[in-house]
Design a protein with these regions (language model features):
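Flexible loop/turn segments at secondary-structure boundaries
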Residues: 122-124, 152, 160-163, 203
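Residue-level detector of conserved catalytic or cofactor/ligand-binding positions
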Residues: 198-212
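Basic side chains
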Residues: 52, 157, 178, 206-207
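The DNA-recognition helices of helix-turn-helix-type DNA-binding domains
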Residues: 77, 160, 209
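Short beta-strand-loop-alpha-helix junction that forms the active-site gateway
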Residues: 156-167, 197
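Anionic group-transfer/hydrolysis microenvironments
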Residues: 118, 144, 157-159, 206
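Nuclease catalytic cores
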Residues: 1-147, 151, 170-172, 179, ...
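Short, glycine/charged-enriched secondary-structure capping and boundary segments
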Residues: 167-169, 207
Length: 212
């Protein structure tokens, strides 16, 4: 299965953060169709929040899930060149420690974890809220957890939105990720989750009937 995932869902480690965001644009754009407000240029505060969000994603990408001390874990990632000094400086050690102590992803014990899996898959345009036939969809799955022929997807968000707002905004995105995995791999996605890295809260969208 690991070889199959490597073939159909390709690791994204070689890509820089700005490339990562560009690759996610198509899925994010599809999710944005559920937003009530138009997308505007980022303010300075929003730009800082975005940079901190990218840094949090990088920390999570390389996180040893058995780590108990945030300072030691961040030092390890810095020493191994897994996270840059500028990104590390954006992170709050108390917030990271709270995340480690929360056990919010403890339910994934026993799963094989695949991180930062990017994909390209053809999907019917209506699933993205568009007209026409099939379109090519690109995206990155933050965390794909596999046990047997079943899978769980987790998407990380660093946002000021509360949990219900995150679900409303990104449930289509998670549905598209589920579709991509099940189309590309012999897996059945049992659950999808949004993990708010700012709230340290995990939510489960329930909109998958859109694309079943």
């Amino acid at each position: 299965l690991r070889e199959l995932i490597g073939k159909n869902l390709v690791y994204a480690y070689p890509f820089e953060a700005d490339t990562r965001l560009k690759l996610k644009t198509s899925v994010t754009a599809a999710a944005a169709k559920d937003e009530d407000e138009p997308m505007n240029y980022l303010s300075l505060d929003e730009e800082i929040t975005t940079e901190r969000g990218i840094a949090m994603h990088k920390f999570m990408e390389n996180l040893d899930f058995s780590a108990e001390d945030a300072a030691s874990e961040l030092s390890r990632q810095r020493a191994e060149g897994l996270i840059g000094e500028d990104q590390a400086a954006l992170l709050s050690l108390p917030a990271l420690q709270k995340l480690l102590e929360s056990g919010v992803l403890g339910f994934l014990n026993g799963y094989t974890l695949f991180r930062e899996q990017w994909f390209t898959v053809n999907v019917p345009a209506p699933l993205c809220g568009l007209e026409g036939g099939e379109i090519m969809l690109q995206g990155i799955i933050d965390l794909l957890a596999v046990k047997g022929d079943e899978a769980v997807l987790v998407d990380y968000k660093y946002s000021g939105k509360d949990a219900p707002s995150l679900v409303k905004t990104y449930e289509r995105q998670l549905s598209l990720y589920k579709y991509a995995v099940e189309k590309s791999l012999p897996l059945k996605v049992q659950k999808t989750y949004i993990l708010s890295l700012s709230l340290i809260h995990i939510s489960e969208p329930t909109r998958h009937s859109l694309i079943s």
